[in-house]
């Protein structure tokens, strides 16, 4: 199984377009300690030829250009991307669908709830129905979006996308609006969970034994954005677990047998983005890799 992390940042990327927090300021200045990062997306293939795109970032055209595996290869119109799978309806996971509208056949997969958030917005009708097939997938149903690649979706604690929030919103609920994926090929297993509000025993059982885990790395501490002075929301309010602390992802997953552990979907205010920081060193010392754009895994 071949895995390419196309985009390793959370919504807005690094640096964010209007941000001068300490981390974004380093990125704007071209400081080598902070790599620029595009928004959350990965691609997975069983053979290096046919690819499944997981989440369609607003930066998808840039990501395709930066990764030769994703380039058109033949004829006037072609793409090695055979299917797209959404893990939620967040803007940074669906906006890139609008870029994939140029008459290229593929199948869009998601749970009924996630797909409804796309179907209910007519702007996505630019993906012509006769070209882009939309396929609903039930939780715990195993399917093959690309031949040789088996995928199972499961609910994880999360929340509805920001643009669908209302007074009834519940943070940490386990529904079909935020899902994790277990991807299998050639006897290897990859767990991809870019959004998760908390770690449950069921989640730990789901991912136990995986050869690699790509997990929500939005915030180091719950109050990262507040500390940076650029926002008032906590990680929990955004539906994202913190890395540190007794209930954080590092401690909560420490006793789970997993091969490689990689943080993805990293917010611009997370100090682990600074490569020589004590925060980065601490995370790495506990067995985690901080993803960057273009990172590849061969399982």
Curated annotation (Swiss-Prot):
Q: Which domain of life is it from?
A: Bacteria
- Tell me the Gene Ontology biological-process terms attached to this UniProt entry: pyrroloquinoline quinone biosynthetic process
Q: Which UniProt keywords apply?
A: PQQ biosynthesis, Transport
User: In what pathway does it function?
Assistant: Cofactor biosynthesis; pyrroloquinoline quinone biosynthesis
Q: Which family does it belong to?
A: Belongs to the PqqB family.
What this protein is reported to do is described as: May be involved in the transport of PQQ or its precursor to the periplasm.
Q: What is this protein called?
A: Coenzyme PQQ synthesis protein B
Q: Which species is this UniProt entry from?
A: Methylorubrum extorquens (strain PA1) (Methylobacterium extorquens)
Q: What is the lineage of its organism?
A: Bacteria, Pseudomonadati, Pseudomonadota, Alphaproteobacteria, Hyphomicrobiales
Gene symbol here is: pqqB
